[in-house]
């Protein structure tokens, strides 16, 4: 099946490669736009040997995205479909060199032809009602910060069950912040999947921009703090980037619609009441600058999107999380944790979840979920590389909870550091969606090994390249190893690729 699939993919990639025109975008890369639709089977497909069976399967592949990077490599993202419906998160990526050679193929190469086993019998409205019932809510009793709480409601093919489902995304702020994906069988109304996707830790021209000073929770002087003045008030709104950065105060509510942009009568945000907001605002700008300057990424989505931070979430909440739209920070219980916005590594970690969402889109369960957590940790380190710890600054001195995670020594902080310690936990909230936080210690240790072999500067470049071009939504640890090897080879050659392999083999990923 794998060799057959590769034959098919090669044909699709080359057909696309020779029927696309190139158009440069704002960040120096090239997005390939499909200007023509092939009206007949290309000669390359007809010439394939019968053993490839390409003629039977070719029509089931759809090209989702094509990007040409600065090295001249063209990256194609393909998905299987059946009956015109795309599968959920099943992706294959094909990478073609400037001299038209396929250098790397990754993704689910074992997937065969999919046959739909059900028929559409329930309506979209019924499916939405069942989705809300499945999470113990109703559409009338939830509140969304932006627009309708029903963000997506498309029919896709669940590749595990081979059944069509309404894939419904629900994001709301009341009665609690949530970002649910619920899959409802189009025939029976059965719930085939439900998952809360929260990623946790455990402009008007007449307005003027100013620089300000502020003190964070650790009483550090954060500057420059970019603010905006409207009439007689200074607001924590940073307009110095293409993407707007805003910081809101929830005043211990959990509904983001209650959030107000933090303001002050002067540009000195030094009173303790502003400390959480100062940290959140300052570090959000630092993260923006990191991705822009180091990776040429304009904001978290690569398109200059806004970054909204909400502080004082709930009462003594020991957490921070990205909910798919914005980042929310709890104040901590003051016994074990300080306000969660005071740790630059945590801010970097949570905002990197957004970068992951807009790039590889790693599915938040099992090994792909552990990779999601790990890449957020690793980039948290890249953003604040003073030590190997994630979240140290948020911990109260003397607290037994200590540092949240260690890239260098995961096993010191209740994480696996080798595949022999890997745990296959249930894919439920109680099972931490397959142990994504526990098992992420394994790729974290592999990242530490890579950094010690290649250095931070090279490692952060190859990690970003792998995240942007080579990882797929369902990537496993072995896929990450191969993706990082290929990225290292692209940028630094065979020797660097071998060192990446050694780093992962040292944690039992062969």
Curated annotation (Swiss-Prot):
Cofactor or coenzyme needed: Zn(2+)
Cellular component, GO annotation: extracellular region
Described purpose of this protein according to its UniProt entry: Probably linked to the pathogenesis of listerial infection.
PANTHER family assigned to the protein according to its UniProt record, in alphabetical order: BACILLOLYSIN
Annotated keywords: Hydrolase, Metal-binding, Metalloprotease, Protease, Secreted, Signal, Zinc, Zymogen
A Pfam family matched in the record: Peptidase_M4_C
Signal peptide: 1-24
UniProt similarity note: Belongs to the peptidase M4 family.
Propeptide: 25-200
GO molecular function terms noted in the UniProt entry: metal ion binding; metalloendopeptidase activity
Residue numbers annotated as active site: 350, 437
Binding site for Zn(2+): 349, 353, 373
InterPro entries assigned: FTP_domain (IPR011096), PepSY (IPR025711), Peptidase_M4 (IPR023612), Peptidase_M4/M1_CTD_sf (IPR027268), Peptidase_M4_C_domain (IPR001570), Peptidase_M4_domain (IPR013856), Zinc_Metalloprotease_M4 (IPR050728)
EC number: 3.4.24.-
Keyword Phosphoprotein: no
Organism per entry: Listeria monocytogenes serovar 1/2a (strain ATCC BAA-679 / EGD-e)
Top-level taxonomic group: Bacteria
One Gene Ontology term from the biological process aspect of the record: proteolysis
UniProt-recorded name of the protein: Zinc metalloproteinase
Details of cofactor binding: Binds 1 zinc ion.
Inducing factors: The mpl and the listeriolysin genes being physically linked, their expression may be regulated in a similar manner.
Subcellular location field: Secreted
